[in-house]
Amino acid sequence: MNIAHIGLVGYGEVGKIFSAGLRVQPGVASVAAWDLKLADPAHRAALQKHAGQAGVVAVDAMQALCARCDCIISAVTASNTLAVAQEAAQHIRPGTVFLDLNSASPGTKQQAAALIEARGAHYVEAGVMTSVPPYGIRVPMLLGGAQAAALAAVLTGWGMDAQPVSEQLGVASAIKMCRSIMIKGLEALVIESYTTARHYGVEDHVLPTLAETFPSIDW
């Protein structure tokens, strides 16, 4: 698998981080981006300025992005996952890789894949396993789909942490979803416990008991 021209759908925090990180990788000739805000006069100038300074080509439509790129990366909100796939499917070229980074359900990813693969393109789902900003493009990712292993080989060659887990779509997303339930649940419990302990003035008494029960955690 050869990838020379990369396109980001979504030029928010994740899109900007991936654009900057991928643009300098060996073999990457160009990085472009499309975001709905580029069609909004209130936001267009600022996004175009940022993209220009970052060496990213800001295009004016999904069609233009698909026409120039052999790898499309979807980095939007979970609620827009399917809408992006629907629009991309109207313009994507056969053989293009479509990497879906969004935190959508396995079922949504499968629906998105059906749209993309019906056009002869290759859909690969990614389960992004933690927050992107501390890691940049090296954020741990699990990949799923028929081309997951081939894409992982390219991404790891760029120093990324991409692990293929299954050719079956939905597996990577399910793993990420189940992990998120646990992690976010634990975070919520810790915050609630700390807040309540501080409210009652017993924080200094609660923390030692937690440290005794869970000695490996720095409470």
Q: How should these model regions be labeled?
A:
Residues 104, 109-184:
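Rossmann-fold dinucleotide-binding core
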Residues 30, 55-57, 97, 122, ...:
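Conserved beta-strand segments of alpha/beta enzyme cores
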Residues 175-219:
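Helical "substrate-binding/catalytic lid" subdomain
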Residues 1-67:
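NAD(P)+-binding Rossmann beta1-loop-alpha1 motif at the extreme N-terminus of oxidoreductases
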Residues 62-123:
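Rossmann-fold NAD(P) dinucleotide-binding segment
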Residues 23, 52, 117, 156, ...:
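Anion (oxyanion) recognition and catalysis
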Residues 11, 74-77, 101-102, 140, ...:
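Glycine- and other small-residue-rich loops at beta-strand/loop junctions that grip anionic moieties
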Residues 13-17, 64, 72, 97, ...:
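Amphipathic alpha-helical hairpins
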